[in-house]
Amino acid sequence: HLVAGASPVVQLVMLLLLIASIISWTMIFNKWTNLKTARTDADAFERRFWSGADLGVLYKEVSGARGTVHGLASIFEAGFREFARLRKQEGVGPITVVEGAQRSMRVALSREIDALETHLSFLATVGSISPYVGLFGTVWGIMSAFRALGNVHQATLGMVAPGIAEALIATAMGLFAAIPAVIGYNRYSNDVERLINHYDNFLEEFVSILQRQAHVPGTER
């Protein structure tokens, strides 16, 4: 009843906040699933990588896998593909080979970072502006309630209270949209940062392996 009785502007504010809240919750659950999958895949690939498997065999497994390769597997695939390509070229020194592989892995890492950070900016935006949008709706609703009092000769609390209550719902909805978004953003930003550090550490370790391998002709590891 309070929502239905609010002014059109306040109702529009409530609708926008409701949409923002629904989208935020959807992104929060999707991000939780995606990050959980990314951590699981990274751990599984790292176990396979450090199990002593031949790099050439591992590369064939990764490149032959169905679907798009993500995470550590994507970084490994990009680096080893460039490493193998440069080693086949005559006149290319070991340092150039390793630097080329490292650049390819950095590009792959950048793509993975972009994928991990998807939707975080939206959560940050919702968390920062929703309270102000709700406050705008509240201020507008209170102004409308007091303007309505100008048409009566004797104002009472009972006449203005419903309008103020309707307006305050906008603030409550703004907080309802903002709080989960802020919590989700802070939590997932921390998780993404840890994953990025994990990826970067693996990249540096793999570069060290490639540096040793680049100086041994005809080896794969």
Segments from the language model and where they lie:
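Alpha-helical transmembrane segments of multi-pass membrane proteins
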Residues: 17-20, 182, 186
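Predominantly long cytosolic amphipathic alpha-helical stalk/bundle segments
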Residues: 40-133, 142-156, 183-221
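Hydrophobic alpha-helical transmembrane segments and adjacent short intramembrane/lumenal linkers
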Residues: 153-167
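Hydrophobic alpha-helical transmembrane segments of polytopic membrane proteins
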Residues: 167-181
